[in-house]
C-alpha cells in the first residue's frame, strides 16, 4: 500500500477520527458522505459495520435497493453493452426471480425483441452508492461457453469523464468456459480508447465455481483495494491514475453495484454447441460494510 498516512501523524489522525465519530448519529445511511480526499484512520483503529444489505427475503426484488436495466444497451448508446454481447435484458420472471431467499438471474436462449438470448441486469444506483467499504457477496456461478456473470461497480456520477476515466471496479467476473477461475479488475486511465486496466485472477484448487456457493469480497479504502475469495486474499491494488487528476482518482468518488449475466461478447466469446441453457447466477446475499 502507498504510504498515505505518515507515522508522525497517526496519533493526531486517530484522535480527530474518534472525535468526529462521537458527533455522528449511530444510524447508518445508505450513502456515505465522506469527502473524496478524506484519509481514513489507521487500520488498527477501525471496525467494519454493516450499512446496507439485501438478504433476498422478499417475494420480489426490493425496489428500494435495486433498479433494472433493459434491452441491448442501444438506448444508452452502447449497442451490445459496449462488448458485442448477445442478450436482451428484461425484468420478466423468466429472467429474474427470488426463491428460497436467493436471487436468481437466468440467461435463456430464446427469441425476444430481436435477440436470440435473454437475461437480467440490476444495479443499486441512487439507492446504494458508496465511497469506500467492504462488499461481500455469496453466490453460485453458472457455466458454459459464452456465459459471463459479473458482480461489479460503476461510478454514480462520472466526474472524471467517460469510461473508463471515472473508473470501474470488478469485484468478480467469471467466464463460463473457465469454471474454476474468477477475475478481479480495475479500469481507469483515460476515456476509451485511452483506458487501461489492472487485475488478477483466483483459481480453485479443486472443483468449479458452479458446484457450490462462494463468498466474493472486495475491501476498498483510500488508496488501496483488496480482493478475497472465501476469505482468502488474492490481490491488492494501490497504484492507478486517471488523466488530469491526482491519485487516488478515479477511485475517490461514490460507486454503485451491478449484478448481471451477459451472453457472448468480446471477452468470453459466443455460446457454441456445448453451451446448455438456461444458466443461473444465484445470489444468497449482498452485504456492504463501512468503517464507523
List each model region and its residues.
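GH16 jelly-roll
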Residues: 26-292
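C-terminal motif of bacterial Sec signal peptides marking the signal peptidase cleavage site
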Residues: 18-20
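Bacterial N-terminal signal peptides that target proteins for export
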Residues: 1-9
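Short, linear, compositionally biased motifs with a strong N-terminal bias
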Residues: 14-15
Amino acid at each position: 500500500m502507498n504510504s498515505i498516512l505518515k507515522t508522525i501523524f497517526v496519533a493526531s489522525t486517530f484522535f480527530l477520527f474518534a472525535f468526529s465519530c462521537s458527533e455522528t448519529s449511530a444510524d447508518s445511511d445508505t450513502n456515505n458522505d465522506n469527502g473524496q480526499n478524506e484519509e481514513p484512520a489507521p487500520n488498527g483503529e477501525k471496525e467494519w459495520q454493516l450499512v446496507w444489505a439485501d438478504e433476498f427475503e422478499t417475494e420480489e426484488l426490493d425496489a428500494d435497493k435495486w433498479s433494472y436495466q433493459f434491452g441491448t444497451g442501444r438506448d444508452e448508446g452502447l449497442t451490445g453493452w459496449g462488448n458485442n454481447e448477445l442478450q436482451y435484458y428484461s425484468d420478466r420472471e423468466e429472467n429474474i426471480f427470488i426463491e428460497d431467499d436467493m436471487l436468481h438471474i437466468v440467461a435463456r436462449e430464446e427469441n425476444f425483441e430481436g435477440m436470440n438470448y435473454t437475461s437480467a441486469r440490476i444495479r443499486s444506483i441512487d439507492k446504494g452508492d458508496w465511497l469506500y467499504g467492504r462488499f461481500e457477496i455469496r453466490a453460485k456461478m453458472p457455466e458454459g461457453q459464452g456465459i459471463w456473470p459479473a458482480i461489479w461497480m460503476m461510478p454514480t456520477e462520472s466526474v472524471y469523464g467517460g469510461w473508463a476515466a471515472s473508473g470501474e471496479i470488478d469485484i468478480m467476473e467469471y467466464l463460463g468456459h473457465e469454471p474454476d477461475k474468477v477475475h478481479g479488475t480495475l479500469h481507469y486511465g483515460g476515456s476509451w480508447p485511452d483506458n487501461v486496466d489492472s487485475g488478477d485472477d483466483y483459481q480453485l484448487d479443486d472443483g468449479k465455481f458452479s458446484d457450490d456457493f462462494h463468498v466474493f469480497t472486495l475491501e476498498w479504502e483510500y488508496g488501496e483495494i483488496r480482493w478475497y475469495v472465501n476469505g482468502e486474499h488474492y490481490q491488492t491494488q494501490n497504484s492507478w491514475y486517471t488523466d488530469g487528476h491526482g491519485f487516488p482518482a478515479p477511485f475517490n468518488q461514490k460507486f454503485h453495484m451491478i449484478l448481471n449475466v451477459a451472453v457472448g461478447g468480446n471477452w468470453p466469446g459466443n455460446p457454441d454447441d456445448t453451451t446448455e441453457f438456461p444458466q443461473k447466477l444465484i445470489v444468497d446475499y449482498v452485504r456492504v460494510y463501512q468503517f464507523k
